[in-house]
């Protein structure tokens, strides 16, 4: 079981020389991938599991984070999330490589795990400890169950459809890519259909808003309040669900007082958070059809296991 879990965790892609092994161990790193040309020289490094990297065919992902764009209409700045969840959803069997320096290595590892990616994270010395902390957390919580989705999206593979998927993920609309309408989904979206014509794809935010309107907020399995830089995911568990919260601004600042609403009655909860105190949830309430709570502080990544 431990070997299977290790294989499912994001790995560290490290191109430093073997004399950096002590630095890796001190940071809490236990497993690395190295360029094939360096593999023989790394084999004798004690205290580390070393594999040869095979980057051919891997998809290069962006370093996750937040960019702030000027909003001319309101003379303010609007956060734009640089996230890769939509690309992972489009390539469920793909292999991925992040180039994520410093604290962004933690977010890259969390994003990869949250979306179920087979990923390696290339980082620098400043990223070693943040990466190791996330890996330690992922080992502690164990593997995720299957993702929960409200929307089945029939993807035609076009760039326009990709941008709509990206916006659905950013707006915390739980989407699953399907080849044909899935009766288990609350809403099926056929990109290019009469209801969702391709002509609207010239304005992807409008199409994402239209999809949200068809679903309705009342039927959404998961909603968050209080931040525009947090992406939430939901995975199934044997006796409940697991809520994933990714703060894409986590390399710069934490989020205080994030409110979460999950459809279903879940009187039991357990919080595991990276870079933040694992406090009890605040203002916890279980109503007739939903569970709500506030997480006091979110640094990079938090997982809330809810049970009946």
What do these predicted regions represent?
Residues 278-288:
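Extracellular/luminal ectodomains and secreted, surface-exposed scaffolds of diverse proteins
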Residues 1-8, 250, 254, 301:
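Low-complexity, Gly/Pro
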Residues 259-279:
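Solvent-exposed beta-hairpin/edge-strand motifs
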Residues 150, 154-173, 186, 226-266:
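Carbohydrate-binding surface patches
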Residues 4-198, 292-293:
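Glycan-processing catalytic domains of CAZymes
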